[in-house]
C-alpha cells in the first residue's frame, strides 16, 4: 500500500513541476533568435544578459 502512495506522490510532484516549467520567462534562446521566438508566443522580445526574455504585450 505504501508503494501506491509513493507512486501517487511522485505523479503529483511531476505534474506540479511540468505545470511550473513552461511559465519560466528566461529561456535558452540567443538574442538573434529572440524576436521570432517570442512572436510565436505573441509576446514582446527583450534581451537581458545575452538571454532572451519574452514579456507579455
From Swiss-Prot:
Protein name in UniProt: Potassium channel toxin alpha-KTx 8.7
Q: Which residues form the signal peptide?
A: 1-28
The UniProt entry's sequence similarity note says:
Belongs to the short scorpion toxin superfamily. Potassium channel inhibitor family. Alpha-KTx 08 subfamily.
GO CC terms, sorted: extracellular region
Q: Which InterPro entries match?
A: Scorpion_toxin-like_sf (IPR036574), Toxin_alpha-KTx_8/9 (IPR008911)
The keyword Secreted is annotated on this UniProt entry: yes
Entry-linked Pfam families: Toxin_6 (PF05453)
Q: Which organism is it from?
A: Mesobuthus eupeus (Lesser Asian scorpion)
The record's note on its domains: Has the structural arrangement of an alpha-helix connected to a beta-sheet by disulfide bonds (CSalpha/beta).
A molecular function (GO) held by this record is: toxin activity
Tissue-level expression: Expressed by the venom gland.
Q: What are the subcellular locations of this protein?
A: Secreted
Its biological purpose is as follows:
Inhibits voltage-gated potassium channel rKv1.1/KCNA1 at nanomolar ranges (IC(50)=8.5 nM).
**Annotated disulfide bonds:** 31-47, 34-52, 38-54
The entry's keywords: Disulfide bond, Ion channel impairing toxin, Potassium channel impairing toxin, Secreted, Signal, Toxin, Voltage-gated potassium channel impairing toxin
